[in-house]
C-alpha cells in the first residue's frame, strides 16, 4: 500500500529542510499535548472523587430536609406550611468566578448565605412550629451543597470535553500528521538521491561525449599532420 505523503510537494532540499522543521514542531507539540491530556485526566479523576462526596452530601442533606418538612407538615398541616413558605424572603447571594485548569476555564462558586433566624426568613413566629424552623434550616444547608454540586459537575463536563478534544489532536498528530511528514521526508530524500544518480549518469555521458570528440579531433589532427608529411 502506498504511503501517505503531502500532496503537491516539491522534492527540493529547501522543501526537505522546511519539512524537517515542521516534523520537529509536530513531535514537540505531540509531546506537550500528551502531557496536557495526562494532567487533565488526573484533574478529572481528582474532581470526580469530589463529585461523589458532594453528591452524597447533597442527597443526605435533602433527605434530612424532606424528613424535617414532613414532620412540619404533620405538626402544622400542609396548608399552613405552604402559607409560611410563600412569605419566605429570598437571601441567596452566589458569587461565580472562574479558574484555569490546563487552559480550561472552570467555575468557582462562593455562596454567601448566613444562618437565618425566623424573622430573617419572613414567616410568622406565632403561626409556625420548631419543626418548620428545622426544615427551613435543613433546606438552606441543602442549597449550599446543590450549588457546590453544580460547580463540580460543570467542571467535570468541561474537563471531559477538553480531554476528548486533546485526545483527538494527539491521535491526529500521532497517526496522521507525523507519519505523513516522515513519509514525505523519505519520499523527498529518495527523489533527491534519484536525481543525483540521474545527474551523475548524465554528467558521465556528457564527459564521455566530450572525451570522444576530443579524441576524434586529436586523431584527425594526427592524420592531417601525417598527410602533410607524406606530401
From Swiss-Prot:
GO terms for molecular function: ATP binding; proton-transporting ATP synthase activity, rotational mechanism; proton-transporting ATPase activity, rotational mechanism. Has multiple subunits with at least A(3), B(3), C, D, E, F, H, I and proteolipid K(x). It holds the Pfam family ATP-synt_D. InterPro entries: V_ATPase_D. One of its GO terms (cellular component) is plasma membrane. The gene is atpD. It is a peripheral membrane protein. Gene3D superfamilies: 1.10.287.3240. It is found in: Cell membrane. PANTHER family: V-TYPE ATP SYNTHASE SUBUNIT D. The lineage of its organism: Archaea, Methanobacteriati, Methanobacteriota, Methanomada group, Methanobacteria. It comes from the Archaea. GO terms for biological process: proton motive force-driven plasma membrane ATP synthesis. It comes from Methanobrevibacter smithii (strain ATCC 35061 / DSM 861 / OCM 144 / PS). This is A-type ATP synthase subunit D. Belongs to the V-ATPase D subunit family. Keywords: ATP synthesis, Cell membrane, Hydrogen ion transport, Ion transport, Membrane, Transport. HAMAP family: ATP_synth_D_arch. Component of the A-type ATP synthase that produces ATP from ADP in the presence of a proton gradient across the membrane.
Amino acid at each position: 500500500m502506498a504511503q501517505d505523503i503531502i500532496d503537491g510537494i516539491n522534492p527540493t532540499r529547501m522543501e526537505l529542510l522546511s519539512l524537517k522543521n515542521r516534523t520537529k514542531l509536530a513531535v514537540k507539540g505531540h509531546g506537550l499535548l500528551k502531557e496536557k491530556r495526562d494532567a487533565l485526566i488526573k484533574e478529572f479523576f481528582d474532581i470526580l472523587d469530589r463529585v461523589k462526596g458532594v453528591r452524597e452530601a447533597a442527597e443526605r442533606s435533602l433527605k434530612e430536609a424532606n424528613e424535617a418538612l414532613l414532620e412540619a407538615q404533620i405538626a402544622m398541616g400542609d396548608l399552613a406550611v405552604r402559607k409560611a413558605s410563600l412569605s419566605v424572603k429570598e437571601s441567596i447571594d452566589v458569587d461565580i468566578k472562574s479558574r484555569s485548569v490546563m487552559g480550561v476555564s472552570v467555575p468557582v462558586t462562593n455562596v454567601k448565605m448566613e444562618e437565618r433566624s425566623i424573622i430573617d426568613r419572613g414567616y410568622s413566629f406565632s403561626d409556625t412550629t420548631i419543626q418548620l424552623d428545622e426544615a427551613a434550616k435543613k433546606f438552606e444547608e441543602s442549597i449550599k451543597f446543590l450549588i457546590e454540586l453544580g460547580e463540580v459537575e460543570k467542571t467535570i463536563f468541561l474537563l471531559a470535553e477538553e480531554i476528548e478534544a486533546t485526545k483527538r489532536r494527539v491521535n491526529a498528530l500521532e497517526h496522521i500528521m507525523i507519519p505523513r511528514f516522515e513519509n514525505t521526508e523519505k519520499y523527498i530524500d529518495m527523489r533527491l538521491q534519484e536525481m543525483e544518480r540521474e545527474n551523475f549518469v548524465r554528467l558521465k555521458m556528457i564527459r564521455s561525449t566530450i572525451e570522444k570528440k576530443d579524441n576524434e579531433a586529436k586523431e584527425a589532427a594526427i592524420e592531417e599532420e601525417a598527410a602533410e608529411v607524406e606530401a
